[in-house]
């Protein structure tokens, strides 16, 4: 059910907020023992919030735009009084004393929290397998991963456990799991949405965005969470347009660029490539003009990212020392030993690996060769995008080189895991808005996602193109049944 449809049913009294929340909680009880999308379910709070909405409606009060909409929140966004773990032993018992800006705005808009979702530890991963509390399964085939790091949110939306969810995207952590799970995932422009209350991974790359079952719902959620925030100095102080009204703008005259370097990748699955190109042709049939463009340094994004992101992570995660909060090792007889043991026991292997990479890249003898060089390449990647947007309105690529892979397939091969984000990372490095939406299925019945990238603050254009494609293609109304959780 779309948010607009739910709003109408609630207003007409066809379904109460409590009935919807009870339905969602029952769905979670049936499905989540298999999926493990949720770390915590806030059933008591959800029912109480739903009852308040029903009481307000009965009293004739006007309702906020997301009244009664059941949401899940990635567990690296702080929720006051509710455990926020980042799927790490380091924060297993951490209960924030404050609310993140994005969740605060959602509750003010009437949304109802169903619970907190699983993720790769501290958002570092592409499969949700690095969670300290167990992996999440893909609803389309439980032997496969849902993607990451926001795999819990993507899986929850795909399996109908919630109407929508929030995730965070540092190098593709919303878009890649959206592709793997057959849902819509939107990463806004860097600074379009506040990061206040998002537990930091890589501060110059992190951005919060929604998972939904359709593009219109993504526009509705972005409308609520976007906007300036004095508590986040990187948040842009620019007006928020009406994203929903932009959806129906005509496609005629829209120029869509196909990035040559993306379709020439050696690791690009043939079915993914052909399906995404069919999506491009569908957009052409709707009035868009297709143009081949070149972003010569697009493929350099992954090497650049795996210097910059771990460097920022090594600084951000230095605060977890076992002294003020977080996991503290027992039995250490000195402060240095306690800190070292707390980090060794509290952080998982992937987080430790990235801290080591980042610390090395920032060390005195290597900073110029690695970190500063990576920042220079980042600038060049941004310049390539700037040049492309001189001739086109939106860029089109596959979201991921492959469909969802088997659980454990890349467990012993970090490089193979990192390559899953090959096509999503450049948008983060350039701070651009990007969206993944379903465009078809492979021979195994697994979803394939197409990625659209727009220029800075051009979310309206991005959503417009995505909406027209979605309405014309009807991909998710014709999906194969396969192993999909009923």
Curated annotation (Swiss-Prot):
GO biological process: translation
Alphabetically ordered keywords of this record: ATP-binding, Ligase, Nucleotide-binding, Protein biosynthesis
A matching Pfam family: Amidase
A Gene Ontology molecular function term of the record: ATP binding
Coiled coil: none
EC numbers: 6.3.5.7
Matches recorded under InterPro entries: Amidase (IPR000120), Amidase_CS (IPR020556), Amidase_dom (IPR023631), AS_sf (IPR036928), GatA (IPR004412)
Gene3D superfamilies recorded: Amidase signature (AS) domain (3.90.1300.10)
Family affiliation: Belongs to the amidase family. GatA subfamily.
Record text on subunit structure and interactions: Heterotrimer of A, B and C subunits.
HAMAP family: GatA
The protein, known as: Glutamyl-tRNA(Gln) amidotransferase subunit A
Organism (species): Prochlorococcus marinus (strain MIT 9303)
Lineage: Bacteria, Bacillati, Cyanobacteriota, Cyanophyceae, Synechococcales
């Amino acid at each position: 059910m779309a948010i607009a449809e739910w709003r109408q049913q609630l207003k007409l009294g066809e379904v109460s907020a409590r009935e919807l929340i009870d339905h969602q909680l029952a769905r979670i009880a049936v499905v989540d023992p298999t999926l493990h999308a949720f770390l915590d379910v806030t059933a008591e709070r959800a029912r109480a919030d739903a009852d308040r909405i029903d009481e307000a409606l009965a009293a004739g009060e006007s309702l906020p735009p997301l009244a009664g909409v059941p949401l899940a929140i990635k567990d690296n966004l702080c929720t006051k009084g509710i455990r926020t773990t980042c799927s790490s032993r380091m924060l297993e018992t951490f209960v924030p004393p404050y609310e993140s800006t994005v969740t605060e705005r959602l509750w003010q808009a009437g949304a109802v929290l169903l619970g907190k979702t699983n993720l790769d530890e501290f958002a570092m991963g592409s499969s949700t397998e690095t969670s300290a509390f167990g992996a999440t399964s893909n609803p389309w085939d439980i032997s496969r991963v849902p993607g990451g790091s926001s795999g819990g949110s993507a899986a929850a939306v795909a399996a109908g456990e919630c109407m929508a969810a929030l995730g965070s995207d540092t190098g593709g952590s919303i878009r890649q799991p959206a592709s793997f799970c057959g849902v819509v995932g939107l990463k806004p422009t860097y600074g379009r949405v506040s990061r206040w209350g998002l537990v930091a991974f890589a501060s110059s790359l992190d951005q919060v965005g929604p998972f939904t079952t359709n593009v219109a719902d993504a526009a509705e959620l972005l409308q609520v969470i976007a906007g300036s925030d004095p508590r986040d100095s990187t948040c842009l102080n620019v007006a928020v347009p009406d994203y929903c009204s932009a959806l129906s703008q005509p496609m005629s005259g829209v120029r869509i660029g196909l990035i040559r370097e993306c379709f020439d990748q050696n690791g690009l699955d043939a079915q993914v490539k052909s399906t995404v190109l069919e999506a491009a042709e569908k957009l052409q049939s709707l009035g868009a003009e297709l143009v081949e463009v070149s972003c010569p340094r697009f493929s350099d994004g992954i090497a650049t990212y795996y210097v910059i992101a771990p460097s920022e992570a090594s600084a951000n995660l230095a605060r977890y020392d076992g002294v003020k909060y977080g996991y503290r090792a027992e039995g250490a007889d000195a402060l240095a030993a306690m800190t070292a043991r707390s980090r060794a026991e509290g952080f998982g292997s992937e987080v430790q690996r990235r801290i080591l990479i980042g610390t090395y890249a920032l060390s005195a003898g290597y900073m110029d060769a690695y970190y500063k060089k990576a920042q220079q390449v980042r600038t060049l990647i941004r310049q390539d995008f700037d040049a492309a947007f001189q001739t086109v309105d939106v860029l089109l690529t596959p979201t991921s080189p492959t469909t969802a892979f088997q659980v454990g397939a890349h467990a012993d091969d970090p490089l193979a895991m990192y390559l899953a984000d090959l096509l999503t990372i450049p948008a983060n490095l350039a701070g651009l808005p990007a969206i993944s939406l379903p465009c078809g299925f492979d021979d195994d019945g697994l979803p394939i996602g197409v990625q659209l990238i727009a220029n800075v603050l051009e979310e309206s254009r991005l959503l417009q193109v995505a909406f027209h494609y979605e309405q014309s293609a009807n991909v998710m109304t014709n999906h194969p049944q396969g192993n999909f959780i009923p």
